[in-house]
Amino acid sequence: MEKTMFKSLSEIKQSYLELLKKIDDPEVISNIKEYSAINKEIAKIREISEKFITYENILKDVEQAKIMLESKNEEEVEFAKMIIDENSLKLDELEEKLKILILPQDENDDKNIIVEIRGAAGGDEANIFAGDLFRMYSKFADELGFRLKILSTNSASAGGFSQIVFSIKGEKAYSKFKFESGVHRVQRVPVTESQGRIHTSTTTVTVMPEIDDSVEIEIKPSDLKIDVFRSSGAGGQSVNTTDSAVRITHLPTNIVVTSQDERSQIANRETALTILKSKLYDLEMQKKAEEESGYRKLAGHGDRSEKIRTYNYPQDRVTDHRISFSTSLKPIMEGKLTPIIDALLAEEQNQKIKESGF
């Protein structure tokens, strides 16, 4: 193991041991807020610390065995060789795991998310596919045991959505969905196509961390233009007799968000502000990504106009262009996204390893 990596792991382990002592302090136990905060910190570094402690213990056994090699007793020498051989393999395996665990973690991986899907090029077919993607993500979220809530919809007359915004809450939700941001292309014969021709349409997906109390987003009231209107369904039909829907325009960025699916104007306003905060935070992340490279761009913080995936229905194939990964389409559309997510995660880890220099 490289000295810089060993030093970094030693520092993490030391912090872990200090936190374990601290959490047993009666004063900390009596302070719920502090106790909870320390518990979270312990949880973040528990796995890497425990694995490094195991690594150190095995390393000591190997070093002691190397001393035994100088013994004149043949049995002791053979026993020492056996210990070295067995433990050297364990050390190599642990080192590879530690290399991944020590990599810089995305600060948003633990957060819940807000997802926006928009029909882009292709008219009705793009909107219909937006609906298909929403169904796919709903099934994936359900498979993971996550909770999904629709925040805002703009249903399309031919089916699907011209826009749909929804939240997903669950353990490390962002880490599971962050690779989905970008342009999704579909190739198939639309329902509206009478001559059986294959059309190509696109839908855009944006995955944003849901902002919690740990993130400060300053929004000045003077920067907001707030409009109220009647909620409407598909085709513009009014579904509410009062002006309960809310549209908020953030004047400095010209970001517009709407919410009309809640029962009251107050609830719609709160939902719209939640979406706006996530959009503003997402905008900051994109700016940072422009100054960086590698894994941040892979996770969709880079060029949002980039075509990331093609869904080819005639050939029953999905291809993720970022990693040249192809698989069967049907399971993916049923929410079985794990093969693609795992492949993207592996590539992210490879890029992090290259950038870290370990």
From Swiss-Prot:
The keyword NAD does not apply. It comes from the Bacteria. The keyword Protein biosynthesis applies. One of its GO terms (cellular component) is cytoplasm. Keywords: Cytoplasm, Methylation, Protein biosynthesis. Residues 291-313 are annotated as: Disordered. The modification N5-methylglutamine is found at Q237. Residues 291-309 have a biased composition (Basic and acidic residues). Pfam families: PCRF, RF-1. It is found in: Cytoplasm. GO terms for molecular function: translation release factor activity, codon specific. Methylated by PrmC. Methylation increases the termination efficiency of RF1. Its main location: cytoplasm. Belongs to the prokaryotic/mitochondrial release factor family. Peptide chain release factor 1 directs the termination of translation in response to the peptide chain termination codons UAG and UAA. This is Peptide chain release factor 1. It comes from Mycoplasmopsis agalactiae (strain NCTC 10123 / CIP 59.7 / PG2). The gene is prfA.
